[in-house]
């Protein structure tokens, strides 16, 4: 995991600006406000649908493939550095209240006093379905065609063509 300080002035200003764009979109998810959200991202494919309640911290390290759908109240704790990038492939379905969390803090209380964040990327390959309320933690890769059960907490990589569920998420079956 790569450290960064989210409390420096530049990053605070960027988060404030991104937060305002998200707030405007969530208040009125019009095409104009959706365009502003998509412009935050490093990449946003054709036919992407994002429902209201979307929140990200920075947006500049988020890439979304074609025809992916993000349901209501998705929280993306992204980082402003490439080590905290989020990649969502083509044809993905992200359920309501899903959290994608690339950012974490030190477990050691003395180290935590430094106020540093740590980031690791999240990669969601093509045709993945993430069920409602699932939490995907930093450093996780989810393979093509996989299904993440509702309410799951994904702490480790998920192989392609696999169904996982639970806290922590465990393999249920292969597809």
Where are these regions (language model features)?
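Terminal amphipathic alpha-helical/low-complexity segments used for targeting or macromolecular assembly
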Residues: 1-47, 107, 169-172
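Beta-rich strand-turn-strand
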Residues: 131-157
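C-terminal end-helix/capping segment
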Residues: 154, 158-175
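Short-chain dehydrogenase/reductase
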Residues: 49, 129, 147, 163-165
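Flexible, glycine/small-residue-enriched loop-and-beta-strand segment within the central core
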Residues: 54-64, 69-141, 167-168, 174-175
């Amino acid at each position: 995991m790569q450290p960064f300080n989210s409390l420096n002035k530049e990053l605070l200003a960027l988060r404030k600006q991104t937060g305002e764009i998200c707030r405007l979109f969530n208040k009125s998810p019009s095409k104009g406000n959706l365009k502003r959200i998509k412009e935050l991202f490093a990449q946003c494919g054709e036919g992407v649908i994002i429902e209201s309640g979307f929140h990200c911290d920075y947006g500049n390290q988020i890439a979304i493939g074609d025809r992916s759908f993000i349901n209501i109240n998705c929280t993306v704790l992204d980082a402003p550095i490439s080590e905290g990038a989020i990649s969502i492939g083509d044809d993905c379905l992200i359920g309501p209240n899903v959290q994608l969390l690339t950012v974490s803090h030190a477990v050691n209380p003395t180290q935590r006093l430094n106020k540093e964040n740590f980031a690791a990327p999240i990669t969601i390959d093509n045709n993945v379905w993430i069920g409602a309320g699932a939490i995907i933690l930093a450093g996780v890769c989810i393979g093509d065609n996989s299904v993440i059960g509702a309410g799951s907490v994904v702490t480790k990589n998920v192989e392609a063509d696999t169904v996982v569920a639970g806290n922590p998420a465990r393999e249920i079956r292969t597809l």
